Amino acid sequence: MSIADIKKTFEQKSARSIESFKSELQKIRTGRAHPGILDQVHVEYYGSMVSISQVANVSLLDARTISVQPWEKGMGPKIEKAIRESDLGLNPSSQGELLRVPMPALNEERRRDLTKVVRGAGEDARIAVRNLRRDANDQAKKLLKDKAISEDDERRSLDEVQKLTDRVIAEIDRLVQSKEAEILAV
C-alpha cells in the first residue's frame, strides 16, 4: 500500500458516498413528480416484497403526475394500496389498469420538515466522508510506523486527504442547499 493507493481508495469510496447521498435525496419528495420516488414503495408479488418498478412501468405524465402501468392485470389494486399506505402522503387514482399518482402541493410545515430530513441526510453523508478520512489517515500513519514512508510523506498524505475531504464535503453542502431550495420553492 502506498500513498497513491490510499488517495485512490479514498476518492473511490467518497465518490460512492456522494452517489449514495444523491440517490437518498431523490427519494425525498418535493412538489415535483419524479419516478424514483416510488422506488422505496414495495408491493407483494408472488409471496415476496418487490419494488413497484419491478412489476410496473413507472413514468411521468406531467411535472406533477406519475403514471404507473402494471405489467400484470391483478397488480393494479395491490400497487394502489401500497402507494396509499406508504409514508409519502400520495393518493393514487385508478383509471382501468393505469394508476395516476398526483403529487400534492407541500404545505409550509411539511416543507420545513423535509428540509430537516435533507440536512440530516447531509450530516450523515459528511460523517461517512469524515470516517473515510480517518481510515485514510490511519493507513498513512501505519505506513509511517512501518517505516514505509517518511514523516514528510505522511504529512503530505494527510494534507492531500484533508483537501479531498474538504472538496467532497463542499459538494455535499452544495447538494443539500440545492435540494433545500427545490423543496422551499413554491
Swiss-Prot record:
One of the GO biological process terms: cytoplasmic translational termination
Single GO term (MF): ribosomal large subunit binding
CDD domains referenced in this protein's UniProt entry, alphabetically: RRF
Keyword field: Cytoplasm, Protein biosynthesis
Subcellular location field: Cytoplasm
Coiled coil residues, start to end: none
Pfam families named in the record: RRF
Gene3D superfamilies named in the record: 3.30.1360.40, Ribosome-recycling factor
Entry annotated with the keyword Transmembrane helix: no
Function: Responsible for the release of ribosomes from messenger RNA at the termination of protein biosynthesis. May increase the efficiency of translation by recycling ribosomes from one round of translation to another.
Family listed: Belongs to the RRF family.
Protein name, entry field: Ribosome-recycling factor
Organism: Methylibium petroleiphilum (strain ATCC BAA-1232 / LMG 22953 / PM1)
